[in-house]
């Protein structure tokens, strides 16, 4: 690709098309300083006021992580019409600024902005990634109000959103309400079923689309492979691969990556490595997604030999420079206890992103290096790097492990008030653990009761563990009751409560719990070692 460069001292008037190319190149490569110089030139020459140029500048600033600067350019646009809003919302959604895109829409809608069909997919994408059901369903209502429900692209986005929420029934209703479904809509629904452990329903839908004369494409087949692979149905995966070939499609990199992903998901790591080798023997070269999918198998078993081989392959092929690959490598080294290797890799990263920062903070947090985690978090804030929900999960984990109760509570509030990030289950689990370790069990329980969502087993598990450490029988019973409802087959929670009764000298309760565990035939989840046997 031809590199576009600018020399500040020798600017001359160029064509509008050339300026557009320069702005796009600076945004793509995140050349913020160079783009600012170009922006200044465009302002002095009067070109910045052109709608097309202003729209490109908005996108440039969002790509560089400068949302406030993007907003300033938008506010100075000569025509703040729907097209400008489409650019602003779309740029935020494409670059991961999901909350900003929703906030911007709320503001514009309050000022009289009518919902435009071009904005809807971006808003639904943001709602999906933020798991903001309330906002997503509000947009769905507006879609019905403005009669956009026959737009196939919008319908596909709605199906994707509801599928991500786990509301497959609502996704199917949206699908069924569309008069004439095309391949894109079918693929969205098939993927929705596959991603929610309903691969058999996905396969039935493929049969339906064939009856309607719509031929499946490679995306259709790969969705089925992914679904059955994650459900650990190897026989069906083989069957789908055969059907795919009979239909004229050869399994591609995505197909093999889906198989590997399912194997890793089900802790069949040796089979995942074998599938990786088979992929190579078929003449297919792994991409960044393949590497990212396979590396967690190395962190689970601490197979550093495999991990280093994959790292070496990434270096040779240039995939190491991919941000998500670099992040996965950091995660692998960190989980295997090789902190120094992770630190070296992080320092060598030329363009650090939110993803790489998050991985390194997690690495420090999980090894008790809270001071370094906080230092890195402060660096992100100081440099204006985007902080997302994972950033706060990582730093709250660090605070919890180090007993930094006040700092953790302040960061939890900062996350909501300054960065407008709605707390997720993982944030609450961190906070319950943080408060529990500090002995603030009542405060932890009050936080659970105030949650806007149903607490999961990690939240209740954190409370039960804290109750055991501090001997709070009353709250322990409450936590154990909820855990028994969420995970009825796991005896571990009952054994934890039994241990608590024993420590308190309540032997009658110990006998009662053991009888209950035996009667219900709870399954005990065995531990495993991360140490590779040689």
Swiss-Prot record:
It comes from the Eukaryota. GO terms for molecular function: RNA binding. PPR repeats lie at residues 50-80, 81-115, 116-150, 151-181, 182-216, 217-251, 252-286, 287-321, 322-352, 353-387, 388-418, 424-454. GO terms for biological process: RNA modification. Residues 459-534 are annotated as: Type E motif. Pfam families: E_motif (PF20431), PPR (PF01535), PPR_2 (PF13041). InterPro entries: E_motif, Pentatricopeptide_rpt, PPR_At4g14850-like_plant, TPR-like_helical_dom_sf. Keywords: Repeat. NCBIfam families: PPR. Belongs to the PPR family. PCMP-E subfamily. This is Pentatricopeptide repeat-containing protein At5g59600.
